[in-house]
Structure formats: structure tokens, C-alpha cells
């Protein structure tokens, strides 16, 4: 009896100790705490507010981990309560899912806990997906659960190319379609919601043909497997891209935070650790690089760009920086790259053949005055080297049957969208094309049109500024903010930023005293921003755009969000402003001419 009581006591002690620490390694916990305090000094503690939230020690450590490494936008645009809710859902999977205790702390921390997958707007998908998927995968082994989640994803989203802006998981479901970057973001979010480590894998450019692709890796029972997002197969490690992937030069993913896993690190920043996954897909080789100046001395912190030939250009697939000894290295598929090294206006380059070259020295002996006019290069991609996993006829037939059924579910949902035929008698016929393009967001666009029927010209002008994707996910409160604002500059979008909060009426009031002078001379607005908005000192920070309201609130941002902020404020005050779609310069119009904005 005493032995039983002692055993129970020790079990309780161990469990409570585990529960109190999200990060069990004290050294890493101290590193995270140091990074958290540094972040608070940059953004201000008002954006980390746990008052009234009843945060446990374990939850607080998880919050500190997220805040330590999240982009500034995620700290200033989403309240602490939002992040805490998602943490609680993630921690719940440790006890509610059968694999919860099998997932290593390292993988849970970096590939389950984080909400952000790529550059999508964050949403409330985690709790929603957990409620639906936890029941659906009940009783399944981990690998089968991954396959089942992908079937669920296929019921809701299929492939369609679109613009560069990435929709959130819930926005993708509403639309029923997404490009590969959106499908993989959605599938990673679904897997993480039930405690399965998952990451978006990306080949920035194929080596053997134009284009790129993104898919998913998920961890089960000690191993990472790949799958085509929203493209279910009977088994893992099988997708349409098995053969192209075997010919790739680079595969990478961004692990949230300071990740200390076994993979080769390509870049480590204060937000993420970019890791090289090429070894999972084909035959690879490593080359050591040494960067020297014209005198042959090692160059510290030289930027080294590894370039793949694609779309008739040498595209930078990854950038690394040399150490104090002037060296760096890369593992890649056995093909050719151009390696371009530079620092302080000096540069040099060389062709690297992975699988043949072992080490290469690049001298920074060129500049703008003496750069070569041409170079004769033969670029050879890796050879195909594919071994497909076995699939029985019964497995293939069952998978095909399921795909057909899943298509019918998705098609039934899409059939609820308005069509030209169903809208042929609509009284506000000029708005019909916008309502049809809105797909799953059609009720919002239709309600907006009808609410402002007495201001139809302005309402239609506003809708005409929106892209097809904007029509599919623009909320009513953003439309109304732009509709009710006094400004004639109706467009709410500058580039591919997230539009999360209303801002035009806010800035009308915030700059009421300065508005007249800013309209007369927009350079004064440029000067105001230069004097009042600090730049994030971290030059390698992940540039997720902040909303203009959070730039105003935090008074700290990066150059991208600062430029968006300028255009949004200018338009709010009736000043015509834009991002030049060709040169990507911020401009305002004065005396009928576009004037470039220079913040430097």
C-alpha cells in the first residue's frame, strides 16, 4: 500500500512539474525569456496584456515563447487573449489526442504551437478545426490521421491559381479554392489543430522547369512524411510531384523561433529558423564556400545568394551570410547553381556543381564600374531519382472513390454561390459581377450593395477597386469604413497587405488638425511619419505587414508597413497616393503629377 501511495505521489509530482514548464530545458527557457524581454523593449509592454486572463505558468511560458519570436505585426494586431486561446487549444491536444504525449517537446514547440504558417492573416481556425477533426480522427493511428485530415481538406478546398496575397485557412474554406501556398497553409493549420507537427515545404524554384510549388510535411511516430495539400493519396510520401521533387535543388521551411533541430540551418533570424529539407527528397551533396576580398582576406558577414535558373533569370533561392572566417556552406540537389557573393558594393560569383565541387572560393573583385558584360554558362539540373511507395489496387480504388465523394461535397457547397443565371433578375444589376466573383463572401457583398442602394455610384466605385480575392474575403466593416469616410480615395488596398481593421474614418479624426496642410503639401505627411514612426532596428525581421492602426498605436514598424501606412493615411485625408505597380515606389499626386516618396 505504501509503495502504491509513493508511486502515485511521484506521478503527481512529475505531472505537476511537467505542467508548470512549457519549456523544460532551463537554458533554452532563459534564452526565450531574454528574447521576450528584448521584444518588449522594442514594441512596448502594452501589447502584452494578461490582466484578467488567469494565465498558468505553463501558458505564460508558451506566451513568452510566441511573443519572443513573432513578427511585430502579430504582437500589435492581435490581442494577447487571442494568442492565449490558441495556446490553450494546442496544449489540450497533449492530453486529448492519442499521440499527444508522443510528440517531442521540440516539435510541439515549433511545429504545433505557432498559428502562423506563412504570411497569411491569422484567424480563429484552430479551435474550429480542433472541434471538427478531433472526432473525425478518433481511433486512428497517427499516419492514418494525417491522411484523413488531408481528405477533410480536399472536401473543402481545391487548387486554383490566384494572386500573391495568401488567404487565411477560413478564407480558403469560404472560397473553396486556393493556390498551392494557400492549400498548404490550410492543411498545416488543420494538422496542427489536432496536435500533429506540420510544416509548409517550399521549393522556391524548380531546377528543371519554370515555376515553384509548396506542399506539406507532417510528423508521425518519429519520422517526417510529405503529402500534397488538399490532394489526398492512399499513402504518405506520394504526390504528383515525387519526380520533380527528386530533381529539385532546394527545399526549405521556416521553423518558428530559434529552432535547434537536426536539419541544416540556412538562415537564423529573430523570428524564424530557415532549414534545408532537400535531403528528404533526392540525392544531395554539400559544398563549402569561402568569400575573400581582392587581397584574398576572408570577408565577414558577406551575403551569399544561391541562385537557380528559372523563368529566364537566376532566382535567389536562399541567402546566407559568412562568419568571421568568411565561410558558409550549402547542401543541395546534384545540379548547378550560380553563387553570388557581395558586401559593400563589391561582388563576385561562381558556378557551383553540387555532387562534383567540394569547396569554392569567391573573390569580391567586381563592382558597378568593372562588372563583366557577359558570361558563358551551362546550367544542368539534377537527374531524376524517384522511388514511389507501394500502393495496392484496393487502396487506389478506395482513394479514387473517396476523392469523387469529396468532390461532390465541395461542389454542393459551391453550387450555393450566385451565378449569372440566378442573378439575371437582380434589381441592382450593375453589382451582379461583383456578387458572383465574391463566391463564398457573396452575402456580404450583396448586403453591402443593398444597404447603400441610395449611394450606388460610390458603392460600385468602391467595389471596382477590389481584386477578385478581395471580393471573396472583404468584411462588411472594412467596406463600410471606406464607404462612410469623406475621402474620394476609395481603395482600401495598397499592395498584398492584410486588411484587418478599419482605418479611414480613424485617420480623418486623428489628423483633423493637420489634414489641410497635408493635402496642400503631402511632403509634410512624409516628414511627420519620418519624425514620429520608428523603424524596427532588426533588418532581418520577417516583414508581415502591420495594419495602419497598429503602426499608429505602436509607433514602430518596418519599411514595408511604413509605406503602406503612408498611402492609407494619405488616402484617408483625400490625397491621391499609390504604390507604383511597375517600380514599386510609394507616390502621391501633386499638381497632376506623381511624386516619389523618399523617407531616407
Residue spans for each PLM region:
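Short, ordered, surface-exposed loop/turn motifs in non-cytosolic proteins
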Residues: 294-313, 334-336
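Hydrophobic/aromatic-rich core segments of domains that either
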Residues: 22, 131, 135-136, 140-141, ...
